Amino acid sequence: GGSLVTSPLLAQEKPGEHLTQPVIHVAKNDVPQAPIQPNHPLDPALRIAYASLQHLRSNINDYSAILIKREFVNGAVSEYEYMGVKVRNRKVSGNNLVTPFSVYMTFLKPAAMKGREVIYVENANKGKLVAHEGGMKGRFLPTVDLDPTGMLAMRGQRYPITDIGIENLVVKLIEKGERDRKHGECTVDFIQGAKISGRDCTVLSVKHPVQRPYFDFHHAQVFIDNELQIPVRYAAYSWPTAGEKAPLLEEYTYQNIKLNVGLTDADFDRDNPNYSF
């Protein structure tokens, strides 16, 4: 439904705030090519996804954003979580990892999580994330190193921190799209005129009318920022029971995105004096 677009959650930015940053070109990473033969409704969507991935890998080194997420976990939909995120995209030259995938997160809402901080850097800290709790718990619990896919780190989460970020989202969309492309029962629509926090987006809507074991969702919407050429929101819904609304599986919205802000190792260092590890 259109209600997504005008959700009060997606607060307006200050008028005139412009998010583009100068584009910095780096060595291109190989991106697999999209299928040529246009014989499945998903093909135009896959072409957009491959182009977006190429753009991310060629032109976007890092970004900061507010991530707002809700997920169906342990039988219920979580409340909205707001996180300030800094992400440095993985960069490879030949077979060498030039820049490891790096994430810093600070939780802003809800109150019980406010102040929680998490850092993950690929190939560092023996593969572990470093975290400390926020809220009341944060006052007496120590900073811990955790396996990203272990039970503690995954509590209340659908996916590990290693899956976070816009590039990972695009990779997942391509994987889902290529898998769904092997089957029929799929309708794809492009809807113009949507806005996410005042920014023009095109919505890619994918529906699988009939529930099948090989489909992940009944309906998914990808909001692509027309200027930034990257997805800024993904929402997926399961099949509704008779007369019910389609239940939410997961939704992720990136707001206040600032590209190529020049993040450094210090942004992903637990000893950063601006952090509370």
Where are these regions (language model features)?
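Short leucine-rich amphipathic alpha-helices used at interfaces
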Residues: I36, L42-D43, V206-K207
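Hydrophobic transmembrane signal anchors and adjacent membrane-proximal interface regions, especially
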Residues: L10-A11, I24, P38-H40, S58, ...
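N-terminal mature ectodomain segment of secretory-pathway/periplasmic proteins
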Residues: H40-G138
